[in-house]
C-alpha cells in the first residue's frame, strides 16, 4: 500500500520531536495493524498552501500512490487566500490523484481560533472564517471524488481544552497532538485502504 502524505507542516510533522510521532508514521502503523504492507512517503512541505499541492501531486504520482492523505488549509487562512481559490486548487489536486488511481482522504482546514496567538476578541471571527474555508474545501473534495475526514470537528475541542496537544511554538501539534489528529483521520484512511485492497 503506497501511502503518500501531501500538504503543509501538519502533514510534514512539524512540532513533534520524533519522526515516529508524526502523522505519516502514525497512519502507516494503523494500516500495518490491519494487515497492509505500507510504503510511506511524505511529500508535504511546511508552509505549503493549496496552490503548492501541484508539485506535491506530481511527486506523489511519479513515486506511485495508492492512498493520498492531504492536510492543507491553515496557511491559506493565515495568508488570506480566498476560500474559492484555495478550494479550486484542492479540487484540482484531488482530481489528479484520483485520475492516477489513488484513493484520497482530505483533512480540511483547522479551526485556527484555538491557537494561543489569536486574541480572544477575534476568536469567534477566526472560527467562522475557518469553518467557511473548510466548508468550501469539503465541497471541492467531494466534487473531485475524494473523501473528507472531519478531523477539525473531533480535534478542535481537544486542542482548545488541552495545551499539551500543542508543540512549544503553540501553533503546531505536539506528539500528543499528532496522535489525536491521526486517531481522527484513521477511520477514513482505513476505509479507503480497505476499498483499495478489495
Residue ranges and their predicted role:
Residues 54-198:
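Alpha-helical cap/lid subdomain in secreted, periplasmic
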Residues 2-5, 10-89:
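Conserved SGNH/GDSL esterase-like catalytic core that processes O-acyl groups on lipids
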